[in-house]
């Protein structure tokens, strides 16, 4: 199975999937449009969250970073007058240093991540969506902000006038992702932010055409008219989408077969048929590994009900 993932929402579903599927049968294609260089090292927030999840090192209270991490380097740099744009833990920083050294040696981001996954003892295949640089920028009233500056630096508070994924039209789907798509018909779009987490992946040239030939199941990150977490609602509105499960399904409608939305949602299950997909209700909140596992079992079973195009 191929899973499209950002750094929030989908990792909780991956937590359930790894309970029911052999790790070597999972390929996780991860958003890289939020990556940035900090203090000479490449930070890949979404990729690292997936790495820490599969290596059982993730901080489950925050669902990012390394559990029990310390921040001595960050604090020391502050004392020396160097203010970093992100609060990076020491163990987390070690990951960034190792990855950056791999890249400086001349290998691709994909190969650097595969090397890291091997170091962390991970059997699942974790792949960046592209080896080309892509960055998400938020158009706010006062400035154009990198997504990390908007979300971490400004706490997601500025009004969003637009979203621009710089470099996406020139970027290519990574060869390893293309290989995975050639060999697997099942694609799961996880409940990550549709605009800034999944959006860059499906906006890569040629990706939507490939997905039209696959069995595609998507899980909604929205319950009612609000996201479970993060700024998805504000971003969807800025992109002209209704902030609802229906709005998410509409965003994916070109290639979507089945859409999973929350059982508490008031959306009409049959309304999704107008978008050309079926819908399935489930508990999508994932408040525990057991809840994640239950959702994962339902989602995996749905693929057997789809006739491949």
UniProtKB/Swiss-Prot annotation:
Q: Which domain of life is it from?
A: Archaea
The record's listing under SUPFAM superfamilies reads: CofD-like
- Cite a single GO BP annotation: F420-0 metabolic process
What cofactor is needed?
Mg(2+)
Pathways per UniProt: Cofactor biosynthesis; coenzyme F420 biosynthesis
Q: Which UniProt keywords apply?
A: Magnesium, Transferase
**Which positions bind 7,8-didemethyl-8-hydroxy-5-deazariboflavin?**
48, 87
Pfam families, per this entry? CofD
InterPro entries, A to Z: CofD, CofD-like_dom_sf, FbiA/CofD
For this protein, the Enzyme Commission number is 2.7.8.28
Reactions it catalyzes: (2S)-lactyl-2-diphospho-5'-guanosine + 7,8-didemethyl-8-hydroxy-5-deazariboflavin = oxidized coenzyme F420-0 + GMP + H(+)
Gene Ontology MF terms: LPPG:FO 2-phospho-L-lactate transferase activity; magnesium ion binding
The record's function comment reads:
Catalyzes the transfer of the 2-phospholactate moiety from (2S)-lactyl-2-diphospho-5'-guanosine to 7,8-didemethyl-8-hydroxy-5-deazariboflavin (FO) with the formation of oxidized coenzyme F420-0 and GMP.
| UniProt similarity note | Belongs to the CofD family.
Oligomeric state and interaction partners are given as: Homodimer.
Question: Which named protein is this?
Answer: 2-phospho-L-lactate transferase
Give the encoding gene's name: cofD
């Amino acid at each position: 199975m191929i899973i499209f993932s950002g750094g929030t929402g989908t990792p909780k579903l991956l937590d359930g999937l790894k309970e029911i599927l052999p790790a070597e049968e999972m390929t996780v294609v991860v958003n890289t449009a939020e990556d940035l260089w900090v203090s000479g090292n490449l930070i890949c927030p979404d990729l690292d969250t997936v790495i820490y999840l599969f290596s059982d090192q993730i901080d489950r209270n925050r669902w990012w970073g390394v559990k029990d991490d310390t921040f001595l380097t960050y604090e020391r740099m502050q004392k020396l007058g160097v203010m970093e744009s992100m609060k990076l833990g020491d163990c987390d920083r070690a990951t960034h240093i190792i990855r950056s050294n791999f890249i400086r040696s001349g290998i691709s981001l994909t190969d650097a991540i595969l090397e890291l996954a091997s170091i962390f003892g991970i059997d699942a295949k974790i792949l960046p969506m592209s080896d080309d640089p892509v960055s998400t920028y938020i158009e706010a009233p006062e400035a154009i902000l990198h997504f990390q500056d908007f979300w971490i630096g400004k706490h997601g508070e500025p009004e969003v006038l637009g979203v621009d994924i710089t470099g996406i039209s020139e970027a290519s789907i990574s060869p390893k992702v293309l290989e995975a798509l050639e060999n697997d018909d099942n694609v799961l779009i996880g409940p990550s932010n549709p605009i800034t987490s999944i959006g860059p992946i499906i906006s890569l040239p040629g990706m939507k055409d490939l997905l039209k030939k696959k069995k595609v199941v998507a899980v909604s990150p929205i319950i009612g008219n609000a996201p479970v977490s993060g700024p998805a609602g504000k971003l969807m509105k800025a992109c002209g989408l209704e902030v609802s499960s229906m709005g998410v399904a509409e965003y994916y409608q070109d290639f979507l077969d089945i859409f999973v939305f929350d059982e508490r949602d008031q959306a009409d299950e049959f309304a999704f048929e107008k978008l050309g997909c079926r819908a399935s209700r489930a508990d999508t909140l994932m408040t525990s590994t057991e809840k994640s596992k239950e959702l994962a079992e339902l989602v995996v079973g749905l693929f057997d009900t789809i006739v491949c195009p």
